[in-house]
Amino acid sequence: TVLRGDVNRIVVGRGTNVQDLTMGHVSHKTAEKPDGAPLIIGDYVTVGHAVILHGCTIGNECLIGMGSIIMDDVMIPDRVMIGAGSMVTQGKVLESGMLYMGRPAKAVRALTVEEIAYLRYSAEHYMRVKDNYLSGTK
């Protein structure tokens, strides 16, 4: 995993896990875009393996499926699930509580109550894995 904040800032929230082979990057500031595009990841987010995050904002309790691509200026609000292999194109603003899938990603349906609960569970699970590793237990 590489999080490269060479020309803008990167923020990773509490309880968030960023899995193997993920690339996080930012966009530089320009006259047209004085803030550029930082990478902001909220609390209790699971970012699956081999995801590309580029200058986007992800809210709290989200799951970004393996192999997904999230482009500049995308706004993902709290409690969103992005299906594996999806691409969210530049500048899209998604809706909370929804499952998005495809290339380009489109809203498929509302998340179930169980799926919404799973978003937090997933992040907490990886926190337990980390704690078990550090304590020498499995």
Stretch-by-stretch model annotation:
Residues T46:
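Short proline/glycine- and basic residue-enriched helix-capping loop/turn segments at helix->loop/beta transitions
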Residues D6, V12-R14, Q19-S27, A31-I41, ...:
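Glycine-rich hexapeptide-repeat left-handed beta-helix
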